[in-house]
Swiss-Prot record:
Stated name of the protein: Serine hydroxymethyltransferase
GO cellular component: a single term: cytosol
Residue numbers bearing the N6-(pyridoxal phosphate)lysine modification: 227
Residues bound to (6S)-5,6,7,8-tetrahydrofolate: 118, 122-124, 351-353
Gene3D superfamilies in the cross-refs: Aspartate Aminotransferase, domain 1, Type I PLP-dependent aspartate aminotransferase-like (Major domain)
Length: 424
């Protein structure tokens, strides 16, 4: 598949092979990662990458866009069908740019916005001080209840009434419970705010009908197209309001982007077509079943799941019962070919670079075909490693590392990813 890369750039070819090997023979539990289909990968590697297409279908600033117009229209139409909305912009290069475009469409620098605190499960673009959103807006953050570790909507309402934000953002990157979009919209309406829902993490679940569709309540919905959607890395913005759609389009181009990535937009179209199938719905149902099972098995073995469990594809695991940091856990599991990410937990006492938890997700494991019985095996392996972490450098006895590596390899060989489908 990469014969020309091999001829022209052996070093990059080697990188591709090593990364292919890492994905094929390791367990991927990072909640924001997934494995795109070969159809999506092929679309991204097509000649569509050569075409500049500033503007929108039928209104381009360059000639020769007749075929990329077809690709973008297909992507838009399929996104609208998938999420039952009237309007879709599929040009954002990422979820962060989708959020930026949505914010800029309805606000001005210096306006007040409300979003979930990053340390409580939000996202950088929801007002973190180091992000553009925290630099150009007056940010009011809400969090989860210190006892239940779920959103307290009465507290959100109190903050909104006090600060009168222009935008209220719902959604997060490490929140495992169903969000009440109806309640958020009621709060937004009460204070005259726009409700923007960032569904990047759970878009696939929404597409499959097993998570409430935020488009029923939000003024604007943003998302990535990878993660649970299993498409190319990119973003999109959805709305049912024609005037907001016009503002969103201007905000993306010429507001914050120039030429769209037409090869990625074509891959988005492929992804949306895949997501409209019954097979995709079955996949998403299994993702949630696997997440619930993994959380249950980890709890049985002494770990604490933040908020008491999960309704989605992800969970946040509190490592304090084992006196292990998120940083050490990430390193130790990585040595055993199990990929996770360290993550802060509510009421965090450590630096984000150390953290007290890890975030786990099941989309990538489920893409391989794994089910509940494999989640039990994986929970056993995770706990075996974590119980034997020696220090902050994530050191574990070689015998344990070798044993877990072997079991991980066996699991991956039982559920191959691209093996036999891609010619190296």
């Amino acid at each position: 598949m990469w014969e020309n890369v091999k001829k022209v750039d052996p070093e990059i070819y080697e990188v591709i092979l090593k990364e292919w090997d890492r994905q094929e023979y390791g367990l991927e539990l990072i909640a924001s990662e997934n494995f795109a289909s070969l159809a999506v990968i092929e679309a991204m590697g097509s000649v569509l990458t050569n075409k500049y297409a500033e503007g929108y279908p039928g209104r381009r600033y360059y000639g020769g866009c007749e075929w990329v117009d077809v690709a973008e229209k297909l992507a838009r139409d399929r996104a609208k069908e998938l999420f039952n909305v009237k309007y879709a912009n599929v040009q954002p290069h990422s979820g962060s740019q989708a959020n930026m475009g949505a914010y800029f469409a309805v606000s001005e620098p210096g306006d007040t916005i409300m979003g979930m605190s990053l340390s409580h499960g939000g996202h950088l673009t929801h007002g973190a001080p180091v992000n553009f959103s925290g630099r150009i807006y007056n940010v009011v953050s809400y969090g989860v209840d210190s006892e239940t570790e779920v959103i307290n909507y009465d507290e959100v309402r109190e903050l909104a009434l006090k600060h009168k934000p222009k935008i209220i953002i719902a959604g997060g990157s490490a929140y495992s419970k169903i969000i009440d979009f109806k309640r958020f919209r009621e709060i937004a309406d009460e204070v005259g705010a726009y409700l923007i829902v960032d569904m990047a993490h759970f878009a696939g679940l929404v597409a499959a009908g097993i998570y409430p569709n935020p488009a029923e309540y939000a003024h604007i919905v943003t998302s990535t197209t990878h993660k649970t959607l299993r498409g190319p890395r990119g973003g999109m913005i959805l709305t049912n309001d024609k005037e907001l759609y016009k503002a969103i389009n201007k905000s993306i181009f010429p507001g914050i982007q120039g030429g769209p990535l037409m090869h990625v937009i074509a891959a988005k179209a492929v992804c949306f077509k895949e997501a409209l199938t019954d097979e995709f719905k079955a996949y998403q149902n299994q993702v949630v079943k696997n997440a619930k099972k993994l959380a249950e098995e980890l709890e049985k073995r002494g770990l604490r799941i933040v908020s008491g469990g999960t309704d989605t594809h992800l969970m946040l695991v509190d490592l304090n019962p084992l006196n292990v940091t998120g940083k050490a856990a990430e390193i130790a599991l990585g040595k055993c070919h199990v990929t996770v990410n360290k993550n802060t937990i509510p009421n965090e006492t450590r630096s984000p670079f150390v953290a007290s938890g890890i975030r786990l997700g099941t989309p990538a494991l489920t893409t391989r075909g794994m089910k509940e019985s494999e989640m039990e095996e994986i929970a056993e392996l995770i706990v075996k490693v974590l119980e034997n972490v020696k220090d902050e450098e994530g050191n574990v006895d070689d015998s344990i590392v070798e044993d877990v590596q072997k079991k991980v390899r066996d699991l991956c060989e039982r559920f191959p990813l691209y093996e036999g489908k891609i010619r190296l």
